[in-house]
Regions:
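Glycan-recognition and catalytic regions of carbohydrate-active enzymes
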Residues: 262-310, 345-353
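C-terminal beta-strand-rich structural cap/linker in extracellular carbohydrate-active enzymes
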Residues: 358-385
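Solvent-exposed beta-strand/loop surfaces of large extracellular or lumenal domains
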Residues: 339-365
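Aromatic- and carboxylate-enriched substrate-binding clefts and catalytic-loop regions
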Residues: 52-232, 236-238
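Conserved structural scaffold segments of CAZyme catalytic domains across common CAZy folds
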Residues: 1-89, 98, 377
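Carbohydrate-binding surface patches
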Residues: 293-333, 379
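Acidic/polar loop patches that form or flank catalytic/metal-binding clefts of enzymes
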Residues: 161-168, 195, 258-266, 270, ...
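Conserved, mostly hydrophobic/aromatic
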Residues: 41, 164, 252, 311, ...
């Protein structure tokens, strides 16, 4: 399947307690809500909509009772056939979600029936989840028991032409080479920790470290793209980045299937969203002009389907000025750089939102000067003319 950004997903509202995974008056995965997200996806050129909480099993303590999950039976207010038909009419796909609560045997018993159903309705990607420290209340995720289970899921998905985004996985070991439908996986302290973690969220140096650690093991679904940092549920917890750094993470943290993590109302009418909608996920070439573990990272990637380049440059809690030579560009071409930078007085602690958007004619001799705020970053689109 073609790699692409799906749109924002029906899940961040649950973390903010505006919606629920389980049934009730605030249930997020409804037909109406999903169709609104599909409209948003079609409007902005996204390829899919990921929905969590659509299926039976979320009521009660689902993490402790994962064997209650059904992966084929939808809640009454989620019309799978209507939604997938509507999505197809808009050129969008529904992305499946299979949270197991760690109940591996229950999931394996339903794999063929579930994936056959999804194939029938044009669902060609599934995000899996295992929110429980043990599989079937007895085995660690990284045990032989767990490895065999994860591999069975990937192999079964391949039979039905379904790609997998695996959350709570085992340590990546290059299985994508054998199973190319394993598009990406979590296996990292991702953006969701910025919604509820008791320690306040990921510190600024986290994202300048993981490209050198977890990033070396394979694609990671970090789920960057948060635009609203206000957290009424856990006021002390929020992304310890600027908004410009959230944009830059889309390039720095590689995943061939990216997930824009925020709610659609936080994206609408924000000019910074243009970078999210323009940034590809399939790259022909990657260069790293500068990087120092835990301090700063600048990564430039060339789009596989065009002659355009995208750059993400990020810093830790220290402000930084980056001199970036564009010598990796075609020496015989001219380009237009669209620069999304930290605005005046921006900082990750109490003023994360200012973003300055500028344009500049550039070529392979250009050296860009990028000023980055504490916890900040710069995202750049370089379009060949």
């Amino acid at each position: 399947p073609k790699t692409a950004w799906p749109p924002t997903c029906i899940w961040w509202g649950m973390h903010m307690k505006k919606q629920t995974w389980e049934q009730g008056p605030k249930h997020g995965a409804t037909t109406e809500n999903t169709m609104n997200y599909i409209d948003f996806a079609a409007k902005h050129g996204f390829s899919g909509v990921l929905v969590e909480g659509w299926n039976y099993g979320w009521d009660g303590d689902w993490s402790a009772n994962g064997d209650q999950f059904s992966f084929t039976k939808a809640y009454p207010d989620f019309d799978l056939e209507k939604i997938t038909s509507y999505a197809a009419s808009k050129g969008v796909r529904l992305i499946g979600h299979n949270e197991t609560g760690g109940a591996a045997q229950n999931y394996e018993a339903q794999l063929d029936s579930a994936f056959a159903l999804y194939q029938k309705y044009g669902i060609n990607a599934v995000k899996t989840g295992y929110v429980n420290p043990l599989l079937d209340h007895k085995e660690l995720h990284g045990s032989q028991y767990g490895v065999r289970h994860y591999r069975k899921v990937i192999e079964t998905a391949a039979k039905y032409n379904i790609m997998i985004d695996n959350h709570e996985p085992v340590m990546p070991t290059g299985l994508q080479r054998t199973y190319p439908n394993l598009m990406t996986q979590e296996g990292v302290r991702g953006q969701e920790y910025d919604a509820w973690s008791a320690d306040g969220g990921n510190p600024p140096e986290h994202t300048t470290t993981i490209p050198f650690t977890r990033g070396l093991a394979g694609p990671m679904d970090f789920t960057p793209g948060t635009f609203n940092f206000n957290n009424p549920v856990h006021p002390q917890t929020h992304p310890q980045t600027t908004l410009a750094k959230q944009l830059a993470l889309a390039v720095v943290l590689y995943s061939p299937l990216q997930m824009a993590s925020d709610m659609i109302e936080n994206y609408e009418n924000n000019p910074a969203f243009d970078f999210i909608t323009s940034c590809p996920t399939n790259w022909a070439k990657t260069v790293v002009p500068e990087a120092k573990i835990g301090e700063y990272v600048t990564i430039a990637r060339k789009d596989r389907d065009s002659e355009n380049w995208f750059i993400g440059s990020i810093t830790n809690a220290s402000p930084r000025e980056v001199n970036l030579p564009l010598s990796f560009l075609d020496a015989n071409a001219s380009y237009k750089a669209h620069i999304f930078a930290d605005g005046e007085e921006a900082n990750y602690k109490n003023n994360p939102y200012p973003v300055t958007i500028t344009e500049e004619n550039v070529n392979s001799s250009t050296v860009l000067t990028l000023k980055q705020a504490p916890g900040g970053g710069t995202a750049i689109m370089i379009i060949k003319e």
